[in-house]
Amino acid sequence: MFKDKTLLITGGTGSFGNAVMERFLESDIKEIRIFSRDEKKQDDMRKLYNNDKLKFYLGDVRDLASVKNAMHGVDYVFHAAALKQVPSCEFFPLEAVKTNILGTDNVLTAAIDYGVKKVICLST
């Protein structure tokens, strides 16, 4: 099913993103794109896994242009980017809305625009 396919994982440096990446890394998938706004975690992953299937995209789901940049040529998406700590979301509700709601809308918009086959959206 994933042979010669490209997978995009938003929030790819987070706990779920790492788990999805590890699951697919040993498969016959062509490319796994890790999309996140954490440059340090991306660099750590790049060094740890040292695998040509992994491609890293620095960006933010709140920015449609950066999402579209990573989405071009993608077959499947696991959307795991989110602010998930309840105290943080309560203290910064606007940031939570921007990331969790508008960010999800950006991911879905880009996926539709680029003809992605399937998007899996996670929620906590």
PLM features: residue spans?
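Short, conserved SAM-binding/catalytic segment
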Residues: D44-L54
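Conserved Rossmann-fold cofactor-binding substructure of NAD(P)-dependent oxidoreductases
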Residues: K55-Y76
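Conserved glycine-rich Rossmann-like NAD(P)H-binding loop of the short-chain dehydrogenase/reductase
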Residues: D28-K41
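Conserved Rossmann-fold NAD(P)-dependent oxidoreductase catalytic core, especially the SDR/UDP-sugar
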Residues: Y76-H79, L83-T124
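Conserved residues in the N-terminal Rossmann fold of short-chain dehydrogenase/reductase
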Residues: S36, L58, K98
